[in-house]
Amino acid sequence: MTKTTRLLRATTVAAILLGLTGCAVHLPASAQTPGKQADGVQVSKAWVKAAGSGMTAAFGDVKNTGSGTAIVVGATSSAASSLQLHETVTKNGAETMQEAKSGFRIPAGSTLHLAPGGSHIMLMGLKAPLEAGQKISVTLRFSDGSTSPVAVPVKDFSGANENYKG
C-alpha cells in the first residue's frame, strides 16, 4: 500500500467518523448509549410535576454505583422544547434557582437527591399538558457522552409552592 493510499484511507475514515459524531446528538430516548458514567448510574423515585403548559420540573434520586465521579451535563425529553439542570443557591439571603452550568457531580457511591426546593431538572416549553398518571421519558446525558433514558411518571404536587411559570 502506498503512502498516498494510506493517507487517503485515513482521511476518508476521519470524515466518516466526524459525520457520525454529528448524527449522535439526536439519540432516541429509548436507547442507552453505553459508557462508564451511564453504566454506573441508577435512578429511583423519579417523577415530574403535572402541568398544563409552560414549565415544570423533574425530581428523583440519582445514585452513582460506579467507581468514578459521574457528571450529568444535560437532559432531553420529547415532552418539552428544552431541559436545564437547576440548582438552588442563596443570593442576598434569599434562595433562588439557577442553571447548574457545570452539571450535577455525583461522586462514586453517592446519591444526588433532586427535590422541590433543591436541585432539579427543568422542562421548559412543554409540548402538551402533563397530566397525573402519564409517563414521559427523560434521557440523562453525562460528561463522557453516555446517556441513560429514564421513565418518569407524572404526579400532582402542591407542596413547597414551587412556581415554574418563569
From Swiss-Prot:
A lipid is attached at residue 23 (S-diacylglycerol cysteine). Pfam families: PCuAC. It is found in: Cell membrane. InterPro entries: PCuAC, PCuAC_sf. It comes from Leifsonia xyli subsp. xyli (strain CTCB07). A lipid is attached at residue 23 (N-palmitoyl cysteine). Its main location: membrane. The keyword Cell membrane applies. This is Putative lipoprotein Lxx21020. Keywords: Cell membrane, Lipoprotein, Membrane, Palmitate, Signal. GO terms for cellular component: plasma membrane.
